[in-house]
């Protein structure tokens, strides 16, 4: 990024997770709108960012279609499975198959030390409807609506929310 002229500001607040980096990026964007552009690589945050990321990541499902046609003679799998934290990998994997009922979609989330342990990032299983980073989605939160810190050994799966696309698919029992 630096080679392309970007100024990189490491996040030193909180636990230095995706949530903390997103907090700082949005804060800087709001405080310096004249020279700051907000771009994120995960399907979280306010519209249109989750949709933009999903569309850009859709090259994954395009490649799946192409390779399946090449090797199997059909362009759809029986199942698609992808991990979800913020959800960019999953969004790209399922993008061109969301409306194809022949394809079963499985979203895997970080269970941590077990969903009943209090040390988990299983937002689909444990989250409640809430707002995080300008997006209405499933969020790990307490009874007062305060966001809880998720637990995962994976840096990409420790987000306390989930992309709204994935929350909707879970709500509709599509994933």
Which role does the model predict for each range below?
Residues 1-21:
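A glycine-rich helix N-cap at a beta->alpha junction
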Residues 83-94, 115-117:
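Short glycine/serine/threonine-rich phosphate/pyrophosphate-binding segments
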Residues 2-3, 94-101:
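Alpha-helix C-terminal capping segments
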Residues 19-54, 74, 99-102, 107-175:
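Active-site/ligand-binding loops adjacent to catalytic centers
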């Amino acid at each position: 990024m630096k080679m392309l002229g970007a100024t990189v500001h490491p996040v030193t607040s909180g636990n230095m997770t995706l949530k903390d980096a997103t907090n700082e990026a949005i804060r800087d964007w709001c405080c310096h709108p004249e020279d700051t552009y907000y771009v994120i690589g995960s399907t979280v945050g306010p519209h249109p960012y989750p949709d933009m990321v999903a569309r850009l990541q859709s090259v994954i499902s395009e490649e799946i279609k192409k390779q399946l046609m090449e090797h199997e003679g059909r362009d759809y799998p029986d199942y698609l499975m992808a991990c979800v934290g913020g959800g960019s990998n999953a969004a790209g994997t399922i993008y061109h198959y969301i409306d194809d009922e022949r394809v079963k979609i499985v979203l895997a989330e970080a269970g941590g030390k077990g969903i009943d342990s209090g040390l988990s990032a299983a937002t689909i299983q444990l989250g409640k409807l809430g707002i995080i980073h300008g997006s209405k989605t499933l969020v790990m939160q307490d009874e007062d609506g305060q966001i809880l810190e998720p637990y995962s050994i994976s840096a990409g799966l420790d987000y306390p929310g989930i992309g709204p696309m994935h929350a909707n698919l879970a709500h509709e029992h599509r994933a």
